[in-house]
Curated annotation (Swiss-Prot):
This is Sodium/hydrogen exchanger 4. It comes from Arabidopsis thaliana. GO terms for cellular component: plasma membrane; vacuolar membrane. It catalyses: Na(+)(in) + H(+)(out) = Na(+)(out) + H(+)(in); K(+)(in) + H(+)(out) = K(+)(out) + H(+)(in). Its main location: membrane. Expressed at very low levels in roots and shoots. Pfam families: Na_H_Exchanger. Glycans are attached at residue 374.
Length: 529
């Protein structure tokens, strides 16, 4: 009697609220994943993303058995869900929590890895798949598909490595891996969108320039939009001072304006990732000093919590999607063909990553040879940077679904094959490379070496000229010759130490003009960030 009543209530609830049961189940599994991840915190081989994937795969297996092989999914994947609801908190938190001093000290290196590196990787993967796929009997992809594949598999997921590295012990390495991860994702999505605008029916010699032009337009306008929203938020919080009456309001303003920046970028067909990242950086630099101490602490925990839940949610879905038999049956490839295509993609990912990490690292060391900062990228660091970018994650999955499915569903055998191969590559790189990350980092950077590296990273810059950061760039109270000599010395310094010089003059401009308007303590009172 009780069983019949329970079944009746369950069926009635499912009929009236069809999303209640799957959402409840997924949230319960999400909680289970958090508990298991906590228990495995000290495990040498497993990290949070691997835990989420394994729990997702186990959940998918149970659902597959309960549904008698019909489905392994709790929820149906929708790339709009990913791009609109899950990705913004992850990217914003990355910008909000970034150690700005190290990030901008290494800005040129990070941008070279995250932008130039993506272009190099995309070219290698696109042409490699175009050449090798037909040799494996996998045909039917268009030129747009091959270019999209290059951008899809150029997007990295550095979460596994960042969970192992410590930014206080290896500040340079952590800054490069973290910064490149964010810029890489943004560049991959921007380049993916630029590829979609190519008119392949009328290709000319200007097509490559058009793609590059579209990329520059999206990159620059998205960045400016994020900076603009961040500055507006900071100005509003400083001027109105919501904390006088309600700390809840000022926290709500920060959350809503951050999300608004992303939605505005999507509305204007820009890159929401870049916009919300730089909005987070600007809010952290200015807005967080215009709120009460309690709101400042709460905001950091809230943004970190939302990011953590979104990341876990995504990896859980990747685990359940691996058992989607519908796509496996629809795929045009046999089991051996699938392994061959996945192997080719993985090999090209390894090659494409190595093709820019090591040469650009050598170039960076050469350009910084006069800085006397003792922060050259050693060969061991280069290996870790290369390894950190081998794992593929949520952005690759979302872009693959966007390119090869319609609302997560495809009946085309070639498209289904690409979705399944993307899932395989993401699972393989995350699980296998993720399992090996901790032993590799511990081998290359023993604990005593890590501490020494950290101490080097905390040293001051002995060769850097000392100058009062509060002095104006030019003074009308001094003679023309004094100003001229100062400008000449500054130009010489710019040629020898470009990054340091730009950073020093930015600090002057920031203290003199920006902070009085948008908030934040004076430089001498600001803790290192």
């Amino acid at each position: 009697m009780s069983i019949g009543l329970t079944e009746f209530v369950t069926n009635k609830l499912a009929a009236e609220h069809p999303q209640v049961i799957p959402i409840s189940v997924f949230i319960a599994i999400l909680c289970l994943c958090l508990v298991i991840g906590h228990l495995l915190e000290e495990n040498r081989w497993v990290n949070e993303s691997i835990t989420a994937i394994l729990v997702g795969a186990a959940s998918g297996t149970v659902i597959l058995l309960i549904s008698k092989g019909k489905s392994s999914h709790i929820l149906v994947f929708d790339e709009e869900l990913f791009f609109i609801y899950l990705l913004p908190p992850i990217i914003f938190n990355a910008g909000f929590q970034v150690k700005k001093k190290k990030f901008f000290h290494n800005f040129l290196t990070i941008m070279s890895f995250g932008v130039i590196g993506v272009f190099i990787s995309t070219v290698i993967i696109s042409f490699g798949t175009w050449w090798l796929f037909p040799k494996l009997g996998f045909k039917g992809l268009s030129a747009r598909d091959y270019l999209a594949i290059g951008t899809i598999f150029s997007s990295t997921d550095t979460v596994c490595t960042l969970q192992i590295l410590h930014q206080d012990e290896t500040p340079l390495l952590y800054s490069l891996v973290f910064g490149e991860g964010v810029v890489n994702d943004a560049t991959s999505v921007v380049l993916f969108n630029a590829v979609q605008k190519i008119q392949f029916e009328s290709l000319t010699g200007w097509t490559a320039l058009q793609v590059f032009g579209n990329f520059l337009y999206l990159f620059s306008t998205s960045t400016l939009l994020g900076i603009g929203v961040g500055l507006i938020t900071s100005f509003v919080l400083k001027t109105l001072y919501f904390g006088r009456h309600s700390t809840t309001r000022e926290l709500a303003i920060m959350v809503l304006m951050a999300y608004l920046s992303y939605m505005l970028a999507e509305l204007f067909s820009l890159s929401g990732i870049l916009t919300v990242f730089f909005c987070g950086v600007l809010m952290s630099h200015y807005a967080s000093y215009n709120v009460t101490e309690s709101s400042r602490i709460t905001s950091r925990h809230v943004f970190a919590m939302l990011s953590f839940i979104a990341e876990t949610f995504i990896f859980l879905y990747v685990g359940t999607d691996a058992l989607d038999f519908t796509k496996w049956k629809t795929s045009s490839l046999s089991f051996g063909g699938t392994l061959g295509v996945s192997g080719v993609i993985t090999a090209l990912v390894l090659l494409g990553r190595a093709a820019f990490v090591f040469p650009l690292s050598v170039l960076t060391n050469f350009m910084n040879r006069h800085t006397e900062r003792n922060e050259s990228i050693t060969f061991k660091h280069q290996v870790i940077i290369w390894w950190a970018g081998l794992m593929r994650g949520a952005v690759s999955i979302a872009l693959a679904f966007k390119q090869f499915t319609y609302s997560g569903v495809t009946l085309d055998p070639v498209n289904a094959a690409m979705v399944t191969n993307t899932t395989i590559v993401v699972l393989f790189t995350t699980l296998v490379f993720g399992f090996l990350t901790k032993p590799l980092v511990n081998y290359l950077l023993p604990q005593d070496a890590s501490h020494n590296t950290g101490n080097r990273g905390k040293r001051t810059e002995p060769g850097s000229p000392k100058e009062d950061a509060t002095l104006p760039l030019l003074s009308f109270d001094e003679s023309a010759s004094t100003n001229f000599n100062r400008a000449k010395d500054s130009i010489s310094l710019l040629m020898e130490q470009p990054v340091y010089t730009i950073h020093r003059y930015w600090r002057k401009f920031d203290d003199t003009y920006m902070r009085p308007i948008f908030g934040g303590p004076r430089r001498e009172n600001q803790p290192e960030c």
